[in-house]
Amino acid sequence: MTVKQQHFVPRCYLKNFANPQEQIFVADKDTPKSYLSNIKNIAKRNYFNDFPVEFLSDEYKKKEESQFVEICLSNVENKFKIALSHIIDRLESIETKEESNEVIDKAFKSHFSFFLALQLVRTMSQRQKFQNMMQDISDLTSKFDDFRTRNQEYPEFSIPEPINSNQSINFNGFKVSAEKDANVQHLFFISDTLDKASSSDISKIFANHIWFFGINSTSIPLLTSDTPIVIKPYQNHGVGIDSYGVQVAYPISPKYLLVMHENSYWSDYKSFDRRSINLTENCVMSHNKLQISQCHRQIYSSEKTFGSLIK
């Protein structure tokens, strides 16, 4: 069966922020107004993970294989749901005991890093980055062509063809010019992450960070968004997920927050890796502001009052 509405943030994740009717409060980052919506209607686009039909061979068109990325993501999400529930159950148990404890073991950390990597690469924000990049290349090529028109003696210029790589799906038979189509390029990126799983570069970076699981006992709920993984850079050392001193945060629910710390600057905390900590009100507020500033468009909350955060 063809799936029309495809999510770039899993519903099993959004459910942790929703009420029993699976409804969640939504706000656009450009306006303080909020509204209640079912999680099935947010963080999604029609056919977001479909390969464009014009890029498929006749054989694959007949098999309706344009949705293989969506199918793979759905299969992974079933495992992600179980892993997420395990972490929440563990944190609830630790919270009851009111003491810091190891939340997960090293093997589970590596396993969960793959889910985080997949979330990072599959969002609308990532799609936009690819679109901006391809537009910049197109603009540059046009300017160069215009320059050559006015300077005939200048040597011909062309962009090198990309080197083929193995993906999670056998792409033999596809007629894809990925370097010229941002959406297809993004789908290749998602597919590559699916294929490599915990062995992907992004997964390894996350697994190498120092993890703290924050418990929010304040009256302010943790927010999430259509780009749930956010980055807090250290001084001027860059905003990459492996930049020196960077902190990468991922809200698990209104009460729980995973914060990953780059392990060279934060090396003194290695002995506390994978343990729980209590979040202060300032920490919760700081994280919520990151969600608002780094979302693509929408912020999600378990409560209607987003308060003074969205300004």
Task: Describe the residue ranges of each PLM region.
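Alpha-helical structural context detector biased toward long hydrophobic helices
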Residues: 1-5, 9-311
